[in-house]
Amino acid sequence: MSIDLEQYDRRRTAMLALLRVAADAAPFSEWMKYSESIARGKREKLELYLKVLYMLLRDLLVLREGGLDIRNRDIRLQLEPLANKVSFAWIRTAVKKADDLAELLRRNIQKTIALDALILELRGSGS
């Protein structure tokens, strides 16, 4: 078993963009290039993106609460401003929405529509 670091980095970059846009720290247009790329990757499963999203949300929570032990240390400088922008309630809502998406995976949902909806719902929930 091996880890394809290039694919992981690509997913992480996309999910970080999703979080930045969802937190209203970036315009929706920033997400569009990733959304289109995800749509083209028809064989790539949404679960792989959700795993990365959960790790990033964990890091945001740790940083927001003053902790130091994050998993994505190499992007700390990108995560810190975002962690300072969002509230605990926003992170909780983001986790709940990701959980809801995970539940829908069995229904063969459209990845990009689901992720776009996640962004819009979080943007509406306030940072």
Regions found by a protein language model. Give the residues of each.
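Charged, glycine-rich active-site and insertion segments that engage polyanionic ligands
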Residues: 1-52, 56-57, 63-127
